[in-house]
Swiss-Prot record:
Signal peptide: none annotated. PANTHER family: UPF0145 PROTEIN YBJQ (PTHR34068:SF1). It comes from Ruegeria sp. (strain TM1040). HAMAP family: UPF0145. The lineage of its organism: Bacteria, Pseudomonadati, Pseudomonadota, Alphaproteobacteria, Rhodobacterales. Pfam families: YbjQ_1. Belongs to the UPF0145 family. This is UPF0145 protein TM1040_1243.
Amino acid sequence: MIVTTTNSVEGYQISEYKGIVVGEAIMGANVVRDVFAQITDIVGGRSGAYESKLQDARETALSELEDRARALGANAVVGVDLDYEVVGQSMLMVSASGTAVVIG
């Protein structure tokens, strides 16, 4: 499945729009607390443990986005946008949204 932030896929024509799809992942309170507890992991102002958790959440959100697009019969998702939101006091939500399409 092709997933892109652009509104089209070079070399392909969009033949059908299937609708908006969204994938989400939430890092729970314990994960965020554990990451900040490992602050000694910081090198050059960056936390490897925190970045790893963010990457996992981003990959989960994108995987869920692809699964939902496949369920609609799409073979690509265009116009993908990633958002990061703090939920409550100690949770982080990563959401990926885009338009499921059929390209050929």
